[in-house]
């Protein structure tokens, strides 16, 4: 009797395992294949300007951002400061996280898709994004982060029973300041941007992933939309780089001034006749 009960329990457990496994396999089949390593596709001739919002245009003013007059001035001041050795409006130069949308313009990406959450693994100072697809409502309060709070939904556009598109909305408040690119192309200082994205594979090339991303921000005169594309590495076992911004970063901000750190660990000016740091807390140093 005991043997029969054990056998029955084993058979039931096996049947449940097969059922769960089959259901899981069926669920996975509904989602697009985004496995592998993805990199931003850049227009030939612009490879040296990797980190920017619109990958088809030069960075800075060449992006054609619809900035308000106030934020055009912020951008111009940023570029002028950089010409004189400063960092301008670009906090990532001192290894602060870029946040949204810069974090979608950097290195290699990996997508981990489940039924309730999609993760975008980024690495470096931006780490990852978490996109909830479990049907949750927007929370009453959102803690400020660099990546923002993202809610998405899967869409079967052609009615074949498989998902084609992931629609995502990302809200703040964000941590800041943030910039689109290395010239300090700015987002508004209120850090209340909203981002709307549509991720989908190219219909003619499954190794190309589109991210149609729209920025709604008070520094803009209208929503700004670009098609960011990523190409999948055809190597089934790609190399994944380990990158930490602080390693080898020579920028050092003291007060509101940017200095360089030399290879032998000495402080260097970044522009002609730059004043040294305030040494008021070092009274033993001769003036």
Predicted regions and their residues:
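Bacterial N-terminal signal peptides that target proteins for export
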Residues: 1-11
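Compositionally biased, intrinsically disordered low-complexity segments
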Residues: 6, 21-23
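Bacterial N-terminal signal peptides
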Residues: 9-19
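PEST-like low-complexity, intrinsically disordered acidic/proline/serine-rich tracts
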Residues: 23-287
């Amino acid at each position: 009797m005991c043997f029969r009960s054990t056998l029955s329990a084993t058979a039931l457990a096996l049947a449940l395992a097969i059922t769960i496994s089959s259901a899981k396999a069926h669920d996975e089949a509904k989602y697009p294949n985004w496995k592998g390593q993805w990199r931003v596709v850049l227009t030939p001739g612009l490879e040296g300007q990797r980190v920017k919002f619109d990958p088809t245009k030069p960075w800075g003013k060449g992006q054609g951002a619809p900035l308000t007059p106030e934020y055009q001035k912020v951008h111009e001041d940023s570029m002028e400061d950089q010409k004189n050795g400063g960092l301008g409006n670009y906090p990532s130069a001192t290894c602060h996280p870029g946040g949204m949308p810069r974090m979608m313009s950097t290195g290699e990406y990996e997508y981990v898709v489940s039924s309730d959450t999609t993760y975008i693994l980024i690495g470096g100072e931006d780490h990852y994004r978490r996109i909830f697809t479990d049907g949750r409502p927007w929370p009453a309060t959102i803690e400020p982060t660099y990546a923002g709070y993202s809610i998405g939904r899967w869409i079967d556009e052609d009615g074949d029973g498989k998902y084609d598109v992931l629609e995502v909305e990302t809200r703040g408040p964000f941590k800041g300041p943030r910039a689109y690119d290395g010239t300090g192309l700015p987002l508004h200082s209120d850090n209340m941007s909203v981002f709307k994205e549509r991720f989908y594979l190219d219909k003619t090339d499954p190794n190309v992933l589109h991210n149609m991303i729209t920025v709604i921000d008070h520094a803009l005169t209208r929503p700004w939309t670009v098609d960011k594309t990523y190409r999948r590495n055809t190597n089934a076992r790609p190399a994944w780089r380990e990158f930490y911004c602080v390693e080898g970063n020579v920028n050092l901000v003291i007060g509101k001034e940017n200095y360089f750190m030399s290879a032998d660990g000495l402080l260097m000016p970044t522009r002609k006749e730059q004043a040294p740091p305030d040494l008021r807390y070092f009274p033993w140093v001769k003036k």
